[in-house]
């Protein structure tokens, strides 16, 4: 089976989310949790941030000697040397690919930047680093510019090109066409870096792989600037395996704990319907669905909850039917007759409407006691 590398950037791009700032202990713990989940390649920081960030990167390196670690650098000799001194495996050297960024960010012509790029690739090689060229804002760059960058990278040589949809403007069809065009002029590795401004980062990531990308950037919980990055720890990784038939090496059962760790460190809530890891994604209420699930657990689930170390859960609410009421109470040790089910169902529906949620087990017991228990029988007597 073909393998695609997940190069997670939670600790670099993910931490660029407004308000997200990991302590040293959190950064190390997240790196360890990523590694335990089978995500062994990660972009761990930016040396340009200063001594504290450098110390954090150094500690991650010490704790994970077998992980494949990358730093993000500008075209700057000091930052590249700092990365080498830290024992990092890869350096991503960023170059503004679009006319807009070159004009307003660096104010230098492409020809000058390409000369410098070749020099910095050579420097990184002499320091024992593998080189990825980060084509920043590639989705707004011309094909001619990307070909020129690829030619310099090929001759230097660099090992990987990162295609960054920096402002998240791509759709899957354009992504596939762009990566395919890049593959025509570049024989090395291609890494897709997708942002989620239009809600298509995961789809664009899969499209890139289908067109020839060999690695993808991801973040836990989809953290990142603006609308975030591709959350490949969940739908992207599983989508790569299920939809494209490629191997990622991700241990999916470890992902809920990883997500919880990052959520706590980032002070972000996990949406209850977040794919794969949300509290409600393996929870069923609808009467038709529950009736089928009670007979066959795969009838309304394409993903086995056990893959994530979880199990499916039945709850009662406004859309529940009689079989669901009977099934849930049976799991609680209550064996209902038809008359009791008919009494309970409207009360459960009223509860859901009034409280805007499903009743918890103890609340179901209270409803049962009120309507069907011995006290209710005595009241009627």
Swiss-Prot record:
Residues annotated as domain Pyruvate carboxyltransferase: 4-256
UniProt cross-references to InterPro entries, sorted A to Z: AIPM/Hcit_synth_CS, Aldolase_TIM, LeuA/HCS_post-cat, NifV/FrbC, PYR_CT
Coiled coil: none
Catalytic activity from the UniProt record: acetyl-CoA + 2-oxoglutarate + H2O = (2R)-homocitrate + CoA + H(+)
Keywords: Nitrogen fixation, Transferase
Listed GO biological process terms: biosynthetic process; carboxylic acid metabolic process; nitrogen fixation
GO molecular function, one term: homocitrate synthase activity
Keyword Transcription regulation: no
Chain segments annotated as transmembrane: none
EC number: 2.3.3.14
Keyword Transferase among record annotations: yes
Family: Belongs to the alpha-IPM synthase/homocitrate synthase family.
Function: This protein is a Fe-Mo-cofactor biosynthetic component.
Protein's recorded name: Homocitrate synthase
């Amino acid at each position: 089976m073909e393998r695609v590398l997940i190069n997670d950037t939670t600790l670099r791009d993910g931490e660029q989310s407004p308000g997200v700032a990991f302590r040293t202990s959190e950064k190390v713990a997240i790196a360890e949790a990523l590694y335990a989940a089978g995500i062994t390649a990660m972009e761990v920081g930016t040396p340009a941030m200063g001594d504290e960030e450098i110390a954090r990167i150094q500690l991650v390196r010490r704790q994970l000697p077998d992980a494949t670690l990358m730093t993000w650098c500008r075209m700057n000799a000091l930052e590249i040397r700092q990365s080498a001194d830290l024992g990092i495996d890869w350096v991503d050297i960023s170059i503004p690919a679009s006319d807009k960024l070159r004009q307003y960010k660096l104010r230098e012509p492409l020809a000058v930047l390409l000369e410098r790029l070749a020099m910095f690739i050579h420097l990184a090689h002499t320091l024992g680093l593998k080189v990825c060229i980060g084509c920043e804002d590639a989705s707004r760059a011309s094909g001619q510019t990307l070909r020129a960058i690829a030619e310099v990278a090929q001759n230097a040589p660099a090992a990987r090109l990162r295609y960054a949809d920096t402002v998240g403007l791509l759709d899957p069809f354009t992504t596939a066409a762009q990566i395919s065009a890049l593959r025509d002029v570049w024989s090395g590795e291609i890494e897709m870096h997708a942002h989620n401004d239009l809600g298509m980062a995961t789809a664009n990531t899969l499209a890139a792989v289908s067109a020839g990308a060999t690695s993808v950037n991801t973040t836990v919980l989809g953290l990142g600037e603006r609308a975030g990055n591709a959350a490949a720890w969940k739908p992207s990784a599983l989508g790569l395996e299920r939809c494209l038939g490629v191997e990622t090496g991700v241990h999916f059962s470890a992902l809920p704990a990883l997500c919880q760790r990052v959520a706590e460190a980032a002070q972000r809530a996990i949406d209850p319907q977040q794919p794969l890891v949300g509290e409600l994604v393996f929870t069923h209420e609808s009467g038709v669905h529950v009736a089928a699930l009670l007979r066959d657990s795969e009838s309304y689930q394409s993903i086995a909850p056990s893959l994530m170390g979880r199990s499916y859960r039945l709850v009662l609410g406004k859309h529940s039917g009689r079989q669901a009421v009977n099934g849930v109470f049976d799991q609680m040790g209550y064996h209902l007759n038809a008359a009791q089910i008919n009494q309970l169902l409207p009360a459960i529906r009223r509860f859901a409407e009034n409280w805007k949620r499903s009743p918890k087990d103890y609340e179901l017991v209270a409803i049962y006691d009120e309507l069907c228990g011995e006290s209710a029988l005595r009241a009627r007597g």
